[in-house]
Amino acid sequence: MSLFSIIKDCGGIHNIQRVLIPDSRIIIEIHEFELLSAEAKQQAYNLTLKQVTYQQTVIENKDEFGAQLLEIGQLISDQQRQDITPYTAPVECEFRPDWHISPPQGLLNDPNGFIYHQGQYHLFYQWYPYTCVHKDKYWAHLTSKDLVNWQWQPVALTPSDWFDSYGVFSGHAISQDDLLMLFYTGNVRIGEQRDRHTTQCLATSTDGIHFTKQGPVVPELPPGVTPHCRDPKVIRHNDRWLMLLGVQREDEIGRLAIYHSEDLKTWTFIALCGDELGDFGYMWECPDFFTLNQQDFIVIGPQGIRSPDKSHTAPHHNGIVKAQLETSGKALLSDFQPLDYGFDFYAPQSLETPDGRRIMCAWMGLPDEIDHPSADNGWVHQLTTMRELSYDNGALIQKPIKELATLRHTPIVLSKDETSFDLHSKAFELQVSMQWGSVLRLHQSESGYCEIRLDSASRRLYIDRSNTLIREGDTVREMSLAESDSVQLHIFSDTSSLEVFINEGEAVMSARVFTDKNSTQLSFDGDVQIQACWLLNKASAPFIS
């Protein structure tokens, strides 16, 4: 019996939710039982999962069977694209950002495939379009000429195939001449116990818009690793390709798995790396790799480590380690430091611009925090602003990209004799110098505000959003600063977010800040000098036109 005959017996392609092929079985998940043929109804059926199982299926021609699977996956994808069309139109919401990337509807999380290819920037992100939950992820696709104004493109990848039908999970991109290659993790769940199966997959495009799935290129797990194995980052190093994967060892310790390849299609395992960091979290997610000023760095998201900030209770962290790549491809890691000391920064990705700058953006959210006020309007989360990374005198420096200056409206002149101002907007850029013991309040009205304060005794900077509309997650973040007479802050504000660059980029703190639409005032106590202020224009909306 051919696979197409099975699909026909199961009610046709429009009745198919997904196809799974564990072991020698073929499992067809359907929408309506009544559409099954009499023969299909004789097969084992799981009422809870709505799955028909064909046992002990003999596959005589594996190449033909594989081609049929990809063809059926494409048909399912075509249907999925039709189904999500109403969800590509943005819903109105008072918390919608003016110049950050947010989803039209549904849930956004990790940025993916951030790359410069054929004269423009490409940025994808994890997206579940239907509701604000983590489920069956798609890859939304945006393009830009300037890293500020983004245009919606057709969804790049949908969860349509036997190897990714429970989610086209995160990954990176490679630009090879005219070919744009997307490496990602295919996520599959089997049975009522939801056994996880993960493979590392490839999709390619010759026009940068329409992608063809090639299937798994790393079909097996690394030795000694659980199915928590994901988020491929592919780099060119020593004249060969390396793939970095975030993994969990079988003893529930997070590590980095490294593979090598000559052709980007056949991959060989090298090693698990990171033992020198010890017991450093139960899982590492979303690796990235780049070189700054001749120093190699690897970004990891270690889950379950202890934060030096006692007010940081979430298990999810992001940071950067120095990396020493050996000729074999194995990496030695050292000197972990956070990339962001705020509330909302996870799963960052970076690219190199044509003029040689390293630019990074991240998900401005965390995996366990979904109940934001915007969810009442059917969407949740946004990406951070783009930041430029450099490495000078042994210090990582992060600054807002220069292109953001194009958003500046007429400068706002604030009186030195006043301590409270109404900007009549939440979208602004602010440069201030604060003395120890001073307090700055932003997004302020009678109903609430977000506060930045410098504690003289502890020499710590605090961001406090406890007087906002936040529903879940921590409300205070803090960090120690070096001895100085004053602290320089470069603040970028949008409708429901703040990003604070500290002391010329020595540290950054990012926060989602939800306040009512009238919360457009700023005020301060103590010695605060406002050096510059601009209202920011809207960027082009990153939605379908």
Curated annotation (Swiss-Prot):
InterPro entries: ConA-like_dom_sf, GH32_Enzymes, Glyco_hydro_32, Glyco_hydro_32_AS, Glyco_hydro_32_C, Glyco_hydro_32_N, Glyco_hydro_beta-prop_sf, Suc6P_hydrolase. Pfam families: Glyco_hydro_32C, Glyco_hydro_32N. GO terms for biological process: sucrose metabolic process. It is an enzyme of class 3 (hydrolase). Substrate binds at L107, L108, N109, D110, Q126, F169, S170, R230, D231, E285. SUPFAM superfamilies: Arabinanase/levansucrase/invertase (SSF75005), Concanavalin A-like lectins/glucanases (SSF49899). This is Probable sucrose-6-phosphate hydrolase.
